[in-house]
Amino acid sequence: MKKHSEREMHSFPASGVILKDPVFRHRQELVRKYLAEFDLERVMYSFRKNAGMESDAEPLEGWENPGCELRGHFVGHFLAACAKFAGNSGDRELKQKADAIVEIMEACADENGYLSAFEEEQLDTLEEKEDTGVWAPYYTLHKILNGLVCCGKYCENEKAVRLAENLGLYIYRRFQKLSYWKIDNILRCTRVNPVNEFGGIGDVLYTLWEMTKNEEILELAKLFDRDYLLGNMAEGNDVLSDLHANTHLPMITGALHRYAVTGEETYRKAGVNFYRMIRSRTFANGNSSSRAEHFLRGGVSEQAEHWGANRLDRTCLTGGESESCCAHNTEKILEYLLRYDPEHRLQYLEHLESLKYNAVLNAFSGKTGLSQYHQPMGADSRKKFSSPYGDFWCCTGSGVEAAAELQKNIWFEEKGRIFLNMFVSSELHLEEPKATLCLQSEFPKKPGACLQVETDQAVSLELAFRQSGVKNVQAHGAVCETSCEDGFLVVTGTFGEGSFLELELQAEIREVPLGKEKEIYCLKYGPVLLAEIAGTYVRKEPLCLNSEGDFTGRDCVFRPLYLVEEETYTVYLNSGESTEAKDGSSAYA
């Protein structure tokens, strides 16, 4: 079995990082408040009813309504989010909420291990009809398993681990009764708009095996590593066209997790090759998904959630591009690739920075903390956020869980060297050496930052910054040496209390084309994607950064996309004829 090495580049745990940036922190706090105020009886209504229990609570609506076959998916995300907030920040209120959910789940669990908000008969239907008549039952079971596993990991709740193991073994026994081809049909999600999607169940089962060392759980996890995708990826065959994006992104995460567990090179190659293929399908916000190349007219695949051909063009600006769930899963993939493909780590770090600002942070409302489903970027777009109790889209759930870890992937470590990848005001608490690194930054309002060291005694540190992001470093109160190494600016020195580095950031406005389109392009300021919110931009005209953080021209105003809330906006500009893209509201029908 392969063991994680501290010599591999990895993100510092979220528990060691505290957000200070007002935008990141505010949105995280909004989600935390939403979870804390949510009526637990409403959350667990469908679990109780499915177990034959009475409930006087008002049932949830949207994708969690009692008649929706996906009911229970948000509950899994809710539990995972509560557990992560508790583990990462010591939040006692949300720990109590997570533990209370586990108690209710224990009461709802069947003796055979089955635990869900929907009846077992949905799995019978899936086994009988294979890809019709149900809506993604293993997708929902993944969310429930993940919530329980997170509660075990972050809250040290052994009961949650036992419930997860029992549910995993229940699933294992079901598959043991099926033939090879029956399993292949059930888990082959190659149609557009697939109803047999199974999410990241393989990924979470690898985590469950790491916790329990139950070999049947490991065998089950491997079952979800499907060769129609991973075999082709390992061999370098681009078969992504027409696949449902967020069905298959978690399969790549699972493959890379399998490599982490077993060391099987095939699954590392699958992840690395997948990334080379997804790059040509990735928008300037770092995220993917739009219409399928061969879509069904009138279906979701005509606008959203799929991958098209290995290029982007103006037809991809449907209003349903860039599903938020895809952003969260892409972030997980990039974390693994940083460890297991160090040759391309600069590219992965730059991608992570762009993704975090422009698709992860951008997913959340600055007023409610709730998420967009899709993130439209064409002409005259509008953001549409989930309502607190009426939608419960997949991205509502993945959003609350992602908010609990917004502080991840700012700071990294490799062989004792500390890498700062984003200039988001935050504190990194180090155990060895004992010190706190305090980053103060107002980027993108101001292209500078200050990194201060707090310590009781002088410490030796090796700090690295991407040269593409940092123009100059000046040390104050510390004796340092600066060198350039493989695209990084490396500062090595001894730091005492109050010593600090003054950072001058690389931040110029540049054009980013849409694929090979010559007339369709967007503007980025450093890693930050800009949206036109007023007027008309004339290509190549100079823009000035004002005191409010907006960029103004002769007759136009641009704003960082993640700061747009209710305004009509355009990300991808057209210097030729007008685009056909409109706002994404129809993608939610």
Task: Report the location of each language-model feature.
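Well-ordered alpha-helical segments within folded domains of soluble proteins
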Residues: 24, 68-87, 133-152, 193-209, ...
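Low-complexity, Ser/Thr/Pro/Gly-enriched N-terminal "stalk/linker" regions
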Residues: 1-74, 92-123, 158
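A conserved hydrophobic secondary-structure block that centers on an alpha-helix together
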Residues: 122-211
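Glycine- and aromatic-rich loop/turn segments at beta-sheet edges
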Residues: 43-67, 108-130, 160, 171-194, ...
